[in-house]
């Protein structure tokens, strides 16, 4: 590892996104709104609250015009957030996360367009059909052949359902025990109580 790579290996999702946002030419207010959205992402990279709710929390006012303006700024900032890496970040649910990634593949020409379109249609259906791998019902919903439906399902399976996962610091989730018991020889020392299991 190079020193830079090692430092980035423990970079948080928030830091990663904020670093990318520095290259965007934004007004001070728009930069603040984007930062606010980034800081409200969960560990998986999802935005759990609605833009309206976030705007109300930030505005501190009941003035409808100010709230509408702030919601508009949040909408623009969310589009910018969706343009950052990892693809799918800022989604408000699994279906949207998958759709963002599929649209990215489509724009970059990294997958056959007809398969991506079928996958997008699948993601617009109730996701329990996909989870159950209900090919017949997905074929009906998409109007695609079995082969194309299966190809679309395979494409979806390759996507990252939790785009923030690689940034979660595993070390912070380690539980340190209060007591560690080790065996010293064949017998417990005389000063320790007997434990029966």
Where are these regions (language model features)?
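Duplex nucleic acid-engaging cores and interfaces of nucleic-acid transaction enzymes
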Residues: 2-197
